């Protein structure tokens, strides 16, 4: 890539846990040596019950291990989770177990999005039928506060600046955590 596009400053890729799992560490290091500097991966939740309900196809431990694999191979890791994904029933577990998954991976970047229900999806059907309740802004903020109270991912940049978020946050961990909580 650098030979064809010398002006290219960085190369990054989205990856699923499955696409990382099928690659050996040697293959991932080769990709790094060829210029791949960062991998974006969706965690969505660190709570296995949420992951099962949302049909993610992977459990938290596997996602964490694939994140660690990327880091071992010398690439930066950006991991995203979704506030509100556990609904009111799993709010606390979703927040705490997601923080624990971030802590275990210690990615360079942590991104938080707020759940948006897309028309025509199974989730939209569950909401319509009453089997899933979308959290309101106050509960999203409570969940975010709980996650921040439990997150301990030294050196990670925490971003919650997507248009879906009620409260934009951006800073480093752990130094900006208290500022976020205040």
Task: Kindly label every feature range from the protein language model.
Residues 122-131:
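Short, glycine-/aromatic-enriched active-site segment of Class I SAM-dependent methyltransferases
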Residues 38, 61-122, 137-161:
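Conserved C-terminal portion of the radical SAM core fold
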Residues 26, 54-62, 89-97, 131-139, ...:
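Alpha-helix N-cap and loop-to-helix initiation/capping positions
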Residues 23-24, 90, 169-170:
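A short acidic (Asp/Glu
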Residues 14-18, 44-48, 82-86, 115-117, ...:
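Active-site beta-loop-alpha junctions enriched in small/polar residues
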């Amino acid at each position: 890539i650098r030979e064809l596009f010398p002006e290219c400053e960085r190369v990054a890729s989205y990856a699923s846990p499955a696409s990382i799992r099928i690659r050996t560490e040697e293959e991932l290091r080769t990709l790094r040596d060829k210029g791949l500097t960062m991998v974006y991966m969706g965690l969505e939740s660190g709570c296995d019950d949420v992951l099962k309900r949302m049909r993610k196809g992977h459990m938290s431990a596997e996602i964490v291990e694939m994140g660690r694999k990327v880091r071992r191979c010398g690439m930066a890791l950006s991991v995203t989770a979704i506030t509100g994904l556990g609904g009111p029933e799993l709010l606390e577990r979703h927040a705490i177990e997601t923080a624990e998954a971030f802590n275990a991976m210690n990615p360079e970047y942590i991104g938080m999005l707020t759940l948006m229900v897309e028309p025509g999806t199974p989730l939209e059907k569950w909401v319509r039928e009453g089997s899933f309740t979308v959290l309101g802004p106050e509960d999203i903020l409570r969940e975010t506060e709980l996650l921040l109270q439990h997150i301990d991912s030294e050196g990670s940049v925490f971003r919650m600046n997507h248009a879906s978020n009620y409260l934009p946050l951006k800073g480093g961990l752990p130094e900006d955590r208290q500022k976020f909580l205040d």
